C-alpha cells in the first residue's frame, strides 16, 4: 500500500491500524534546534483523544505518546523523529459479525476491491485512528510555525444544519475548547449538543463543517502550478477520513457572485499592500497574499449507525441487512478539529521551508 507519506521538505509517514498493537508517525525534515517535549505533542493528542464527552466514541484510550528518536537534550536534531502511541482498548470481537458484510459508507468494500484483503477490525488502516500520527506530526509543525508568528484556529462552523455566527480569530481561540462540540459560538454549541443527543437516541449520526483560519502567513508562499498552496491544503484536508468537500475563501458562493462582488480590491494600509476584503481566502494564483487563510472542510455523518441498512454478504453474494453495534462517534467534526489544524500546519511548514521563509540553519543561532 503506497500513499502513506505526506509532504516534500517537511514530511510525515504515518503507520498502524485501529486494532493493531500501536499507531505512530515518522517526521522527516524538521530542522535541528527546535525545542520540544512529549508534553507539546501530548497537548494536541489529548484534544483528539476518544472517550472525553457525549459527542465522541466511548472507546477509552490514554493515547500517551512516546518519542523514540530525533531529540537530544530537549531539542530536535534534524534527524527523523519517530513517535508511537499504543492501542489499549480495542475490542476486535465486536467486528466479527461484519467480517463478510461491508458497512455502508465505510471503506470496507473499496479496500477489498483494491487489495483483495482487509483488516475488518475497526476499519484497520482506513480508521480515523490513523490520524493520531497526523496530529503528532502536526504538533511539531505548529511549534515550528509559532517561531515565525503563524497561528492556526480551527472550529466547528456548522453541525447538523446549525451554523455558528461569525466570530473573530481571538474569540474562536478563547471559546473553542469550552464545549465538547468545539463550536466557538456557545449558544449554537448548545443547540448542536441537543441535535447530537437526539440523533444518537435514534441510532443515527450527523455531519458538519470545520473551518480553519490562519494568521501570520507571509505573502508569497506557494509553488504554482501543480503545487499551489490552496491545492495542497485541499489535498491535506480531503485526505482526512470522512471529509467530502473543501472550499477556500468565498468557496462555492463564488459561483453565484459577479466579478465586482468577488474581487478583493487592493489598498495601502500602514505602508503595506492589503485588501479591503478577503473573498480569495488569502490565496491568489496558488500563492499566499498575506491576508488570513480561511478554508473549510465538509464532513459527512459517521457511517457507523444503529439503524438497519442494506448491504451484501461477501461469502454468499446475496443481499442482506446490517445494524452497526460497538463504540462509535455520533458526529465527527468536533474531534476532527485538531486533525484539520495539524494538516494545515504540515502544509504551511512544508511550503515555508520550500520557499525559503524558514531557514533551517537559523533555528540554532
UniProtKB/Swiss-Prot annotation:
Pathway: Metabolic intermediate biosynthesis; chorismate biosynthesis; chorismate from D-erythrose 4-phosphate and phosphoenolpyruvate: step 7/7
Free-text remark on how the cofactor is bound: Reduced FMN (FMNH(2)).
Keyword list, A-Z: Amino-acid biosynthesis, Aromatic amino acid biosynthesis, FAD, Flavoprotein, FMN, Lyase, NADP
Gene name per UniProt: aroC
Single GO BP term: aromatic amino acid family biosynthetic process
Keyword GTP-binding carried by entry: no
InterPro entries: Chorismate_synth, Chorismate_synth_AroC_sf, Chorismate_synthase_CS
GO molecular function: chorismate synthase activity; FMN binding
Region listing for Disordered, in residue ranges: 41-62
Protein name in UniProt: Chorismate synthase
Species the sequence originates in: Methanosarcina acetivorans (strain ATCC 35395 / DSM 2834 / JCM 12185 / C2A)
Amino acid at each position: 500500500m503506497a500513499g502513506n507519506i505526506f509532504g516534500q521538505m517537511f514530511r510525515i509517514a504515518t503507520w498502524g491500524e485501529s486494532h493493531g498493537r500501536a499507531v505512530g508517525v515518522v517526521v522527516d525534515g524538521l530542522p535541528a534546534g527546535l525545542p520540544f517535549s512529549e508534553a507539546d505533542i501530548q497537548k494536541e493528542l489529548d484534544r483528539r483523544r476518544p472517550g472525553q464527552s457525549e459527542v465522541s466514541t466511548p472507546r477509552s484510550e490514554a493515547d500517551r505518546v512516546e518519542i523514540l528518536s530525533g531529540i537530544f537534550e530537549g531539542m530536535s536534531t534534524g534527524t527523523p523523529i519517530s513517535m508511537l502511541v499504543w492501542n489499549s482498548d480495542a475490542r476486535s470481537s465486536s467486528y466479527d459479525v461484519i467480517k463478510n458484510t461491508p458497512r455502508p459508507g465505510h471503506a470496507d468494500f473499496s479496500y477489498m476491491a483494491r487489495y483483495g484483503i482487509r483488516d475488518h477490525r475497526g476499519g484497520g488502516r482506513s480508521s480515523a485512528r490513523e490520524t493520531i500520527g497526523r496530529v503528532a506530526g502536526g504538533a511539531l509543525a505548529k511549534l515550528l510555525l509559532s517561531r515565525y508568528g503563524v497561528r492556526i484556529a480551527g472550529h466547528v462552523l456548522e453541525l447538523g444544519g446549525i451554523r455558528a455566527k461569525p466570530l473573530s480569530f481571538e474569540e474562536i481561540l478563547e471559546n473553542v475548547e469550552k464545549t465538547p462540540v468545539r463550536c466557538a459560538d456557545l449558544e449554537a454549541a448548545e443547540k448542536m449538543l441537543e441535535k447530537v443527543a437526539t440523533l444518537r437516541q435514534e441510532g443515527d449520526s450527523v455531519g458538519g463543517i470545520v473551518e480553519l483560519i490562519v494568521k501570520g502567513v507571509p505573502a508569497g508562499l506557494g509553488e504554482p502550478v501543480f503545487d499551489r498552496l490552496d491545492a495542497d491544503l485541499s489535498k491535506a484536508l480531503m485526505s482526512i477520513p470522512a471529509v467530502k468537500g473543501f472550499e477556500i475563501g468565498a468557496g462555492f458562493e463564488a459561483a453565484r457572485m459577479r466579478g465586482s462582488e468577488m474581487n478583493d480590491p487592493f489598498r495601502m494600509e500602514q505602508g503595506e499592500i492589503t485588501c479591503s476584503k478577503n473573498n480569495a481566502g488569502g490565496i491568489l494564483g496558488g500563492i499566499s497574499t498575506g491576508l488570513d487563510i480561511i478554508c473549510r472542510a465538509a464532513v459527512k455523518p459517521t457511517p457507523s449507525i444503529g439503524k438497519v441498512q442494506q448491504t451484501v454478504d461477501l461469502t454468499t453474494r446475496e443481499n442482506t441487512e446490517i445494524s452497526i453495534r460497538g463504540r462509535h462517534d455520533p458526529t465527527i467534526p468536533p474531534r476532527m478539529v485538531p486533525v484539520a489544524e495539524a494538516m494545515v500546519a504540515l502544509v504551511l511548514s512544508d511550503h515555508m521551508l520550500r520557499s525559503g521563509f524558514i531557514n533551517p540553519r537559523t533555528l540554532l543561532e
